[in-house]
Amino acid sequence: MSRVSQARNLGKYFLLIDNMLVVLGFFVVFPLISIRFIDQMGWAAVMVGIALGLRQFIQQGLGIFGGAIADRFGAKPMIVTGMLMRAAGFATMGIAHEPWLLWFSCFLSGLGGTLFDPPRSALVVKLIRPEQRGRFFSLLMMQDSAGAVIGALLGSWLLQYDFRLVCATGAILFILCALFNAWLLPAWKLSTVRTPVREGMRRVMSDKRFVTYVLTLAGYYMLAVQVMLMLPIMVNDIAGSPAAVKWMYAIEACLSLTLLYPIARWSEKRFRLEHRLMAGLLVMSLSMIPIGMVGNLQQLFTLICAFYIGSVIAEPARETLSASLADARARGSYMGFSRLGLAIGGAIGYIGGGWLFDMGKALTQPELPWMMLGIIGFITFLALGWQFSHKRTPRRMLEPGA
């Protein structure tokens, strides 16, 4: 085995272990934020939505800067610093009793994410061969789902005792992750050339095809982020207990572990990437509309199943398409900018979703936020169809198995 092949093989295992630690640390804390501050402390949903939206926007909106800096200085220092910063954010969240302190903790968490997330994504592009990326992204998503359930179960159990224990556990996991990267991650360059920060950013911004694709995905993310805000609130409201939230993530894990990899393997040879992305988005949109009208957990979990199936179809295609479109001379910058759609869509989804949820309750129209999200999903579906029908993306990057 050549040294390059050996490095790629070892890199896969490193990425999988690193990803599991990050997912566990995140999901111990974040699914419980809405339950802690809305249900237990009685805050308005929009206040918590602002906090979650701020974290999302900081982490993803500034990703191009984190990616460009990583292109210049390498992945390791950015990843280690970012993970320590997120640990500090979680520690601060544990003592948050005023909205401004929750917002500050989410700001720190998001800033840490903008440092470590783009270089981690760029390492996947660097280490995994193009023909294997779709399947590797599917493996990461399966791992994300399993980690989400384990993290949510652990967080829900700790929440019975003290929210500070929840945050301390998340902080410790990110400190361990920082030490793991500091010890084992080689000083790899992300790009084929050492690209200056401004040059990497300029290269991305001049790529109109990539910019259009990323911004169009904002609507997709408005739906996707509700697994952190409105879906847990809805489950808690109908069940009458925050313990039921863990079953929502158990459903996601079961579907991902059983369907994600087989669907990705089967569809990658038969359907173009944009068709898989659009099909998944359509299923997600259709499942959102009736959620506000359900009256029991069985109906709600059925719709959540449909939503997750849509995500299982769409996510590997979205990640693979983003990676395929990245310029090898500025991988960090491209993968950082690819998060901008999540920044915009996530911020609007959290803040707008929280506001619509409060508004729906005030007007006794609980279906209002869900209907709006479904409409946004359909608009995004049409926008993606228009974009791809105009051949804005090179055909070879969209072909099955590309």
UniProtKB/Swiss-Prot annotation:
Q: Which residues lie on this side of the membrane: Periplasmic?
A: 34-98, 160-164, 235-243, 298-299, 361-367
Cellular component terms (Gene Ontology) = plasma membrane
**What's the main place this protein lives?**
membrane
Classify the protein's membrane topology as the record does: Multi-pass membrane protein
> One GO molecular function term?
transmembrane transporter activity
Pfam families, per database record = MFS_1
The record's keywords, sorted A to Z, are: Cell inner membrane, Cell membrane, Membrane, Transmembrane, Transmembrane helix, Transport
Positions on the Cytoplasmic side per record topology? 1-12, 117-138, 186-213, 265-276, 321-339, 389-402
Record localization: Cell inner membrane
The membrane-spanning stretches of this chain are 13-33, 99-116, 139-159, 165-185, 214-234, 244-264, 277-297, 300-320, 340-360, 368-388
User: Which positions make up the signal peptide?
Assistant: none
Read off the PROSITE patterns from this record.
MFS
* Family per similarity comment: Belongs to the major facilitator superfamily. DHA1 family. MdtH (TC 2.A.1.2.21) subfamily.
User: Which HAMAP family does the UniProt record give?
Assistant: MFS_MdtH
Record's protein name: Multidrug resistance protein MdtH
